[in-house]
A protein has these predicted regions:
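C-terminal segment of classical bacterial N-terminal signal peptides
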Residues: 15-23
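Bacterial N-terminal signal peptides that target proteins for export
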Residues: 1-9
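Serine/proline-rich low-complexity intrinsically disordered segments, especially terminal tails, linkers
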Residues: 8-11, 20
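Hydrophobic alpha-helical membrane context
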Residues: 14-15, 189
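C-terminal and inter-domain tail/linker signature
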Residues: 23-189
Length: 189
């Protein structure tokens, strides 16, 4: 047993010694210009993604949750394309604001307070959020008709995928399970 440990110790010392250059001239000269350029590109991408994700947090936690619609331009382009969970797509920030406002008519306490998962790649980011609220006001359904509130709370997992250009989203994909949402607020069995 001692001999096996001794052999292992000697092997470890050999590996450590061989990893240390004998003299300064043996040190690697650095990365190739191509590799250094790629490293800088990746670092720049990571910085941009971190900035975009920080903007995303501000969007959901503050702008959306507090209905600060005059600030939506901080995260969305003027001509943003938004793809909604029910399959419809809207064009332009004003239409997007109109749709967002409609969510608060029947659930004024709608809130997103957490992004447990967030990441990005290139010009894209994605966050998973948890949207909560209470169906506490009448829900307009068109033609002057309303669904009366049930008082039921909702707590749904949602995901947003955003394409960023010049520091704002020019395209946004929203995902959540509408059937689960409707069940939670008491409109589906």
């Amino acid at each position: 047993m001692k001999r096996a440990l001794s052999c292992l110790s000697m092997a470890a010392l050999f590996l450590m010694a061989s990893a240390v250059p004998a003299k300064a001239a043996d040190k690697p000269a650095g990365y190739s210009p191509e590799m250094q350029a790629r490293i800088e590109e990746v670092q720049k991408e990571r910085t941009t993604i971190a900035k975009d994700l920080k903007t995303f947090d501000e969007l959901d936690f503050v702008v959306f949750s507090n209905q600060e619609w005059t600030r939506l331009h901080e995260s969305h382009s003027k001509d943003v394309q938004v793809h909604w969970p029910d399959g419809h797509t809207t064009s332009g920030i004003e239409k997007h604001i109109e749709d967002l406002k409609a969510m608060f008519v029947y659930a004024p306490d709608t809130n997103i307070a957490v992004h447990p998962v967030k990441f990005g790649s290139g010009e894209w980011t994605s966050v998973i959020g948890v949207m909560t609220g209470t169906f506490s006001k009448p829900m307009p359904v068109g033609d002057g008709k309303f669904i009366q509130p049930t008082g039921k709370k909702f707590n749904i997992t949602m995901c947003t995928v955003g394409h960023w250009k010049d520091g704002v989203m020019d395209e946004e994909y929203l995902f959540w399970d509408n059937a689960t949402f409707m069940r939670q607020i008491g409109l589906l069995q």
